[in-house]
C-alpha cells in the first residue's frame, strides 16, 4: 500500500510552492474521467501545447487526450487495432497509444502516481528536496517532466549509451543529468549511482520505479 502518513510542515511548503507557481494538482478521478476537469482548466489548455512545460498539462496525464499537438481537449481513449492480416490470429488485439501523452510517453502517468502522494502528504518537499529518477528511458523522461510541472527539481539518471536526443531534452527539463556506464541493458549501474547519491546527499528522494507502488 502507498504510505499516506502526513508531514504537516512539509505539506505547508508544498502548498506554498503550488500557490507561487500557479500549480493545480489534478485528482486521479479527473485523470480517469476528464469530463470532471473544470471548464476554467479546459479553457487554459486551448492555448497550451501538449509538450509545453506548463502546470496545466498535469491535467493531460490521461489516455483520453484529443490527438492534436496543441490546444486539444479530451475525448475517447487513443488506441489502434492491429488487423488479423498483420498478427496472424483471429483475436482482436488493441494497442493503447502513448503518443498523445505529454512527452509522447505514457510514463508521465506512472511518475505522477509516484510523486503526487508524497507531495500532498508532505513526504516530499519541493522546496528543499530533489526528485531522483533512475531509468533507462521513458520513466526518467516522464519523471523529470512531471516534476517540472509540479515545481520540483529533478536528477535524471540514465545510461550514457541512450540517444543524444534524450540527453538534450533532459538537460532542458531536469536540473541535473547523470550518465552511467553502458546502454539500456546496464540497469545495475543506474542503481549503483542511486546508492552513491544516498550516501553523499541528504536533499534527495529516489523514486525507484521497481519499488514504487504508484508505478503499478
Question: Over which residues does each language-model region extend?
Answer:
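PLP-dependent amino-acid enzyme catalytic core
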Residues: 1-216
